[in-house]
Amino acid sequence: MAASVEHDSLESMEAPQTAVEVEETKTFKDLGVTDVLCEACDQLGWTKPTKIQIEAIPLALQGRDIIGLAETGSGKTGAFALPILNALLETPQRLFALVLTPTRELAFQISEQFEALGSSIGVQCAVIVGGIDSMSQSLALAKKPHIVIATPGRLIDHLENTKGFNLRALKYLVMDEADRILNMDFETEVDKILKVIPRDRKTFLFSATMTKKVQKLQRAALKNPVKCAVSSKYQTVEKLQQYYLFIPSKFKDTYLVYILNELAGNSFMIFCSTCNNTQRTALLLRNLGFTAIPLHGQMSQSKRLGSLNKFKAKARSILLATDVASRGLDIPHVDVVVNFDIPTHSKDYIHRVGRTARAGRSGKAITFVTQYDVELFQRIEHLIGKKLPVFPTQDDEVMMLTERVTEAQRFARMELREHGEKKKRSREDVGDNDDTEGAIGVRNKVAGGKMKKRKGR
C-alpha cells in the first residue's frame, strides 16, 4: 500500500515538486549516483543534471519502474544509463541490461554514452542492429557484454538463431522512443522479446509522446510505474522562431535555394518525406554548389554514419533527411530546420523542429506549405496552439533563380536515372541486407562515381 501512496503523491505533486528539486539539487551526487559515475559525468562535461534526470534517477535508484515522457535533447539517455551502471557496479553481471531503440543511429549513440560513462569501470556494450554483418554480432554476443543495445527486428533474429544467446538473466529493460518503436510496427517483435526475458526485472520506458499504443505497452511491460514528465503538452521551445511559406509546389526547389542563400553561414537540416526526394534534392543542391549530404533509410549503415559524422564535424552545412533522422539523433548544431515536405503526422513537426534551438540557443524553423498541404498545416498550428508568421521573401529575387534551378533539376534527374540503372545491375549481382525503416533493398551509391568526377572538374 505504501508504494501506491507514494506513487499517487508523486503524481499529484509533480509540477511543484520538480520546481523545488531543481532549486535544491545541483549535482549528480545529490541524486544518489556513486562517485565513480559522478566523475565520469564531469569528464563528459555534464555539470548538472537535466530535469528528466533529476526526476527519474532517484526513483530508478530506489528500484521503481519508470515512464519518462521527455523530448529529444532532454538528457534522457543519462536518466536511464546512470541508474543501470550504478546497479551494475553493485551487482556485476553479464547481459545485465537491454536497451531497445527504433533506429540504428540511435543505438550507436546510446552505446557511445554507455561506454563513455562506464569507461573507468570497463563496461562492455554490443550494438545489435540491421545493416551490419550478423556473424560479427553473434561473436560480440558470445562474449556476453554487460549492455545490449538493439533494434527489435535484429535482436529477435539473434534470440532465435544465435546458439547460446539468451536474456534469461536480464535485470533491466529500457525502451527508448517507445512511441516510435511501435509506430514502426515492431509490436510483435517487442511482444516476443517480453516473453523471453525475466518477469522479475526493472523496466524504463521513454517516449516523447504518450500514445494509446504506448499506454498498452506500459500495461504489459511495467509494474506500478512512476511517471516522470518534463515536456508539457506538445510545446515547441520558446527560443525557436517558427515561420511558414505558402508557395506553389512547382517552385519549392527555387524557394529552398533562395532560403539557403539568404541564411548562408548557418547549418541547415532539411526534411523531405521520401528517400527519393531526399536524394534528388541533395543532388540538386550539390549541382548548385551547396555542400549537402543526404541521410535516409535506403543508405547502407556505414554511409549513414559517415553522413552524420561529416555534418557533426561541420564539414558539411546542409543535412537532408527523412523522418528516420528526425528523432533521437544527437546532432549538436542546427541553426535552421526547413520542412521542405510538410510532415503528414503533426506530432512529427514537433520532433523535426526540436533539432534546433537546443540547450538554450535560438533557432529558426521554416515550413513549406503548398496548395496541397493547407489542411496538414492547419493541424500543426492547432497542435502547437499558435499561428505562425510568414517568412519574409523577395519574390522577384526568388524568380531570378528559376533558370539555374531548372537546369540543376535536369541534372539531378539524369543522375538519379543513371544511378537507378546502375543499381538495378548491381542488385542482380548482390543481395541486400538493410532492414531498418522500410529500406526496400536499395543501397545509395550516389556519393561515389559521378559526383566525385564533378568535384574534380
From Swiss-Prot:
Reactions it catalyzes: ATP + H2O = ADP + phosphate + H(+)
Sites of N-acetylalanine modification: A2
Binding site for ATP: A70, E71, T72, G73, S74, G75, K76, T77
GO biological process, one term: extrinsic apoptotic signaling pathway via death domain receptors
Entries under Pfam families matching the protein: DEAD, Helicase_C
Purpose: Involved in apoptosis. May have a role in rRNA processing and mRNA splicing. Associates with pre-rRNA precursors.
Family assignment from sequence similarity: Belongs to the DEAD box helicase family. DDX47/RRP3 subfamily.
Stated name of the protein: Probable ATP-dependent RNA helicase DDX47
Organism, as annotated: Bos taurus
